[in-house]
Amino acid sequence: MLGIKGSPVNTAYDVVNLQQGTIEWLEWRNNGIGASDAPVIMGENPWKSPADLLLEKLGTAKKFEGNAAMARGTALEPEARKRYEAISKICVAPACRQSNKHNWQRASIDGLAASGNTVVEIKCGESVYRRTVNSRQVPS
């Protein structure tokens, strides 16, 4: 990454070249702590306990195959990203980052600008999905 006048920007995170959704990506995620894990660790996730997360990280939890809502979110994410780009005029791409100081700190980012100064988290809730299907319009 380059900063002012082409000088390198010191970042706390290294680029991890993985395609999100692959087996390799899932293994990488499971071998560290990411943003999605934080609410679980804090006891703020009503669907997963810290003990469940620990079993996941140890590889001993019952494998979760996902559900219809997750499948919809995954399917809509590329279109939501395009819509964000059209509105904001900022190009973003999925990205994986890992702390260069604490390699267990990880981020699987829905959208990151090449400059590194814009991060997008995409959520496609069911009510938004229904409105989108009915109106045939991507929400703004």
What kind of region is each of these model predictions?
Residues 1-75:
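Charged, glycine-rich intrinsically disordered N-terminal tails and low-complexity linkers that flank
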Residues 62-63, 68-140:
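Mg2+/Mn2+-dependent nuclease catalytic core
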